[in-house]
Design a protein with these regions (language model features):
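Conserved Walker B
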Residues: 1-4
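Basic, amphipathic alpha-helical bundle interface domains used for macromolecular binding and assembly
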Residues: 6-175
Length: 175
């Protein structure tokens, strides 16, 4: 992801946030709907070995910071989920088969539809988040601590709620 130009990365902000993009030309403007799943990858550092247990990182702190800073905070704020991938070894006993995963996703979609949602969790509006992502007092307290500790923006809090709702649906839980 950081290897794309800054202008391309910043151009992703509108479609990621608003599900639309405005193309302006000399005499006209055209609005296109942009419903898509954004999946991206980046190394933890320029050499790619920062989190490796097998190889040594060759980067200094300045290089790592410069690499990470290629993505602006507003751009990062529009990404729903970050997953850090460590070295993987085949002795993991918690592997879920593709078939099981597929079945869980279908059940989660059905659960969302039965709840009356017009959109999947990832595309819920602010109003729908309040309707479908209901937290008990303990969850509210945990979210407030996270907001303060990680300086979460309003947008980030909504993303946390949508991801939590999705995880709950996949695990067949209410919340």
């Amino acid at each position: 992801l950081p290897h794309f130009s800054k202008s391309i990365l910043e151009a992703l902000r509108e479609p990621l946030e608003d599900n639309k993009i405005l193309i302006s030309r000399v005499n006209s403007k055209i609005m296109y709907e942009t419903k898509f799943i954004f999946i991206a990858a980046m190394n933890p550092c320029p050499c790619g070995n920062l989190l490796s247990s097998l190889k040594e990182c060759r980067c200094n702190e300045l290089e790592i910071q410069r690499y990470k800073n290629r993505l602006s905070e507003p751009c990062l704020d529009r990404i729903d989920l970050y997953v850090v991938m460590n070295d993987s070894f085949s002795d993991n006993k918690n592997i879920v088969s593709s078939k099981e995963l597929h079945e869980n996703v279908i059940k989660a979609f059905s659960k969302q539809k039965n709840r009356g949602q017009k959109e999947l969790n990832g595309k819920l509006s602010e109003e729908d988040i309040k309707r479908y992502c209901i937290l008990d007092d303990e969850a509210k307290e945990i979210l407030e601590k996270a907001r303060l500790n990680y300086q979460l923006t309003f947008r980030s809090i909504n993303k946390v709620l949508k991801v939590a709702r999705t995880i709950a649906d996949l695990n067949d839980n209410e919340i």
